[in-house]
């Protein structure tokens, strides 16, 4: 025959698959699981081993003769077990130890189902159980097989005694006692059910335990007599209670179960020892004393029947339901108690939302929705939507409402509706005019004086003299910072002076100074007289309607003629008081300080006549005199306060920028917290460099200032985009002409904003035919890397005025071949750019005849062409000159020389009166007496 599976062989032999696998492994047969195959020889070996083990573990057939005999045997076994204690088995069959095997009990024995474990008892008679034996599953099929074998060879009573099948009755008794007895102290299964429902469900039909008998209880819970110990320490049932042995039910000792009811589910009995390492399934059971004999457990089939009837130890049994029901009832009682307590407790009243009164007037904006109106009216949006629905208007809470709908809703509520008027906070000019016209709480203020005049007429010298005479007296450190504006004190009265440059490029700065000034001091040199910038300053002052005080300077110089200056100024409407006019003339010498105090007195006199006043209690407004980008402070602006008082921390909008005044510095370089009217200060804290002559206004809060500044910046950007020239049919021809023009791209960086504007204006006025200046970027501050990058991308020239490039910018410029020109004098910057513009024009060339040659002889040469021999009649002829062949006054050919020789040598030049030989490149039709003109193209300089 062929091979057979392990599970087929186990089925034939009525044994467990695991028993067959264990025997096969002991015999050295390779099997892995119940699906492994064995041949006939291996099958015979396993059969023989099964027969030997069945015969070896069967107890004597006379083991159950008398109870007294069993008691003696049990006593002997107790003595023997005390000498060699080992872990006791938790299964229904208590296995014998090594001492019992040594006695070689030869009595007939029935086949036993389980592998016996070694049993130990302590000195007080308690049995020590092993964890591994308590939880070891048991096969029902094996139990049936063993029982059938025992019936074949022995009586039913001996068979039950040998295999320990009395546990069925014991288990039933325990189950009955669990269901009927309210005292749980001795009820092992009931405690076990309450604490380990899940584990009982898994191991109901697989575990067999040996509970400890309780003293003084000779009968079971149902009144039946307890089984007595037979021969070999085994229990024997009465004949009437013998049943077919089934798979045994797991029963715990009573005392262990009572402890387990108070422990977590995962705990094990603490009095445990490891099970024996030897294979104990087929060893002989050890005798147990009668006092410590375990209660017999019921078979698995009986337990299954009990489970179906609702009894037994199953999770679906009666006792388990009873235990769970008690817990459920306890929870029910607790829940009902809590519910009654909650009902009897006083209920807290829910806070009611207070109805806020309606406003007297609804200030609305067109486009508001129901949510926005609900916040103003203190009503829910749903209420407003319902009202509008009743009024015939269908809207939702996010829909914008028009003016009529909002007024209709206000009328329904019985309140007035008023549309909110928006003010353009970004219109600084309007705010500036309103603040300047404020006539409340006016107080006298210092006059603002602007000094104007031509270059080198002594304006700066006069200011320096005023500062050193009236400012630095009593100042320890002197002037620490130059901000272009100063205050001079005379007789406890202050005068504010503004300096303006005299060069023609600074027209805007002069006009700006005239706009913000109260009095103009016109400085005219007595030796030079009236100059172009003097006339321009007069026009600016007259346009601003500012009174003019003429200071005739340099009267100490030889050749000075103040009267001639006065005569010249009368042509422009400046008539001296001595001549019947109203213009004040003061003859001074700024270098020596002559008549300086007289000039100051005249200024104060004119200020008294003007009655200059301002309100220091309102929000400050003023004008930017100068602005720059400081390396450490950031954007810095020099401003002149014209109305109100400027405080540190005020939210401010300056031109198209905004910020908060972080710090203020006066003309002495000292920090101040307040700036009164007519006081020049330098402020920091703005986010960008403003333009000169920009207005500044202080706002109530920073949020409004930010909104106004951002709006102004946005409008300025849009305006700049609008200024871009778009091509139309009207300007198409002009655009095409401009496209033919060459451009010089320039980037301007200067120290102050006024210099930037002056230099840009001067460069744009340079007139070179065919070339124009294109300023692609202008800013305040040092030349940085971004400027160099922009110049490299646009092929532009960087012009720095009183600034220097950073180290990184300089290195990058050298790497990118960017031209950086640094200047401190505006004349030189303008001249250099003008020269560059002229150099960008395409050069103009004109022809110049340098010599003539008369052909005397022609010699045709193969592979060379016609060789000409002749004399230089006039001038000279060079190798790289152009030639023109003229025959009878008609130009036959114009080209280049192919070669030029004198005798056999190649030469570069042949002068007049010398013979030569030459060839004309790519031309051979040359005849005797032809004239050859040599000429060159020379570049004509740009005028």
Swiss-Prot record:
One of its GO terms (cellular component) is cytosol. Its main location: cytoplasm. Residues 553-556 are annotated as: G4. Residues 35-359 are annotated as: Disordered. Residues 130-141 have a biased composition (Polar residues). GO terms for molecular function: GTP binding; GTPase activity; translation initiation factor activity. InterPro entries: EF-G-like_DII, IF2_II, IF2_N, P-loop_NTPase, Small_GTP-bd, T_Tr_GTP-bd_dom, TF_IF2_bacterial-like, TIF_IF2. Residues 478-482 are annotated as: G2. NCBIfam families: IF-2, small_GTP. Belongs to the TRAFAC class translation factor GTPase superfamily. Classic translation factor GTPase family. IF-2 subfamily. This is Translation initiation factor IF-2.
């Amino acid at each position: 025959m062929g091979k057979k599976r392990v599970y087929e062989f186990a089925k034939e032999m009525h044994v467990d698959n695991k028993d067959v696998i264990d025997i096969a492994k002991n015999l050295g047969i390779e099997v892995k699981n119940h699906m492994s195959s064995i041949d006939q020889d291996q099958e015979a070996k396993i059969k023989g081993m099964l027969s030997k083990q069945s015969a070896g573990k069967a107890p004597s057939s006379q083991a159950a003769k008398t109870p007294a005999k069993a008691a003696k045997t049990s006593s002997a076994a107790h003595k023997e077990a005390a000498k060699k204690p080992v872990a006791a088995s938790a299964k229904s069959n208590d296995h014998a130890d090594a001492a019992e095997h040594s006695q070689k009990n030869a009595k007939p024995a029935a086949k036993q189902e389980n592998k016996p474990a070694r049993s130990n008892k302590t000195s007080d008679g308690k049995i020590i159980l092993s964890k591994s034996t308590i939880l070891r599953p048991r096969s029902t099929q094996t139990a049936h097989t063993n029982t059938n074998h025992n019936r074949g060879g022995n009586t039913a009573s001996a068979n039950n005694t040998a295999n320990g099948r009395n546990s069925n009755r014991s288990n039933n008794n325990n189950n009955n006692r669990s269901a009927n007895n309210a005292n749980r102290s001795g009820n092992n299964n009931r405690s076990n059910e309450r604490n380990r429902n899940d584990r009982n469900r898994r191991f109901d039909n697989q575990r067999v335990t040996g509970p400890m008998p309780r003293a003084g209880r000779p009968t079971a819970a149902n009144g039946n007599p307890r089984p007595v110990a037979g021969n070999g320490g085994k229990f024997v049932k009465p004949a009437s209670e013998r049943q077919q042995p089934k798979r045994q039910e797991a029963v715990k000792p009573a005392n262990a179960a009572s402890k387990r009811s108070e422990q977590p589910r995962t705990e094990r009995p603490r009095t445990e020892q490891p099970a024996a390492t030897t294979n104990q399934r087929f060893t002989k059971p050890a005798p147990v004393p009668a006092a410590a004999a375990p209660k017999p457990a019921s078979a698995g089939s009986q337990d299954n029947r009990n489970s179906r009837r609702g009894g037994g130890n199953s999770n679906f049994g009666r006792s388990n339901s009873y235990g769970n029901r008690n817990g459920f009832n306890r929870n029910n009682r607790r829940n009902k108690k809590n519910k009654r307590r909650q009902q009897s407790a006083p209920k807290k009243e829910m806070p009611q939302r207070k109805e806020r009164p309606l406003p007297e007037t609804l200030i609305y904006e067109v486009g508001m929705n129901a949510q926005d109106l609900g916040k103003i009216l203190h009503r829910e949006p749903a209420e407003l939507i319902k009202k509008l629905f009743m009024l015939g208007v269908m809207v939702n809470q996010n829909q914008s409402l028009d003016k009529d709908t909002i007024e209709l809703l206000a009328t329904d509520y019985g309140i007035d509706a008023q549309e909110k008027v928006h003010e353009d906070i970004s219109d600084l000019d309007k705010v500036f005019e309103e603040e300047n016209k404020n006539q409340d709480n006016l107080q006298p203020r210092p006059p603002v004086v602007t000094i104007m005049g031509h270059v080198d007429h002594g304006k700066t010298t006069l200011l320096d003299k005023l500062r050193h005479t009236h400012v630095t007296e009593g100042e320890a450190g002197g002037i620490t910072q130059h901000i272009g504006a100063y205050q001079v004190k005379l007789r406890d009265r202050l005068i504010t002076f503004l300096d303006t440059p005299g060069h023609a490029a600074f027209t805007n700065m002069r006009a700006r100074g005239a706009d913000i000034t109260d009095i103009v001091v016109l400085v005219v040199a007595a030796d030079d007289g009236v100059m172009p910038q003097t006339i321009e300053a007069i026009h600016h002052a007259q346009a601003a309607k500012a009174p003019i005080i003429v200071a005739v300077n340099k009267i100490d110089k030889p050749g000075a003629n103040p009267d001639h200056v006065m005569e010249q100024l009368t042509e422009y409407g400046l008539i001296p008081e001595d001549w019947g006019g109203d213009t004040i003339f003061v003859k001074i010498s700024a270098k020596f300080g002559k008549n300086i105090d007289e000039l100051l007195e005249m200024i104060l006199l004119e200020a008294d006549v003007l009655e200059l006043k301002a309100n220091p209690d309102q929000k400050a407004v003023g004008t930017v005199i100068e602005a720059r980008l400081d390396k450490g402070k950031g954007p810095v602006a020099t401003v002149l306060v014209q109305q109100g008082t400027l405080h540190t921390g005020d939210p401010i909008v300056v031109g198209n920028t905004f910020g908060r005044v972080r710090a203020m510095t006066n003309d002495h370089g000292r920090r101040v917290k307040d700036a009164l009217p007519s006081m020049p200060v330098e402020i920091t804290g703005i986010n960008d460099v403003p333009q000169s002559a920009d207005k500044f206004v202080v706002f109530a809060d920073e949020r409004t200032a930010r909104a106004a500044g951002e709006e102004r910046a946005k409008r300025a950007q849009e305006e700049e985009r609008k200024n871009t020239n778009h091509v139309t049919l009207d300007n198409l021809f002009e655009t095409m002409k401009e496209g033919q023009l060459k451009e010089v791209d320039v980037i301007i960086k200067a120290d102050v904003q006024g210099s930037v504007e002056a230099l840009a204006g001067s460069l744009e006025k340079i007139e070179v035919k065919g070339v124009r200046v294109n300023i692609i970027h202008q800013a305040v501050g040092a030349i940085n890397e971004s400027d160099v990058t922009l110049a490299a991308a646009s092929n532009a020239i960087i012009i720095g005025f009183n600034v220097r490039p950073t180290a990184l910018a300089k290195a990058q410029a050298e790497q990118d071949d960017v031209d950086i020109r640094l200047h401190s004098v505006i004349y030189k910057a303008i001249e250099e750019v003008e020269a560059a513009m002229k150099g960008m024009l395409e050069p103009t060339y004109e022809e110049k005849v340098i010599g003539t040659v008369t052909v005397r002889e022609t010699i045709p040469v193969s592979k060379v062409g016609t060789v000409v021999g002749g004399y230089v009649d006039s001038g000279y002829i060079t190798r790289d000159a152009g030639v023109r062949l003229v025959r009878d006054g008609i130009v036959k050919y114009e080209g280049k020389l192919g070669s030029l020789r004198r005798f056999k040598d190649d030469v570069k030049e042949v002068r007049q009166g010398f013979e030569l030989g030459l060839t004309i490149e790519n031309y051979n039709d040359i005849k005797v007496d032809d004239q050859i003109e040599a000429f060159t193209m020379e570049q004509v300089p740009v005028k």
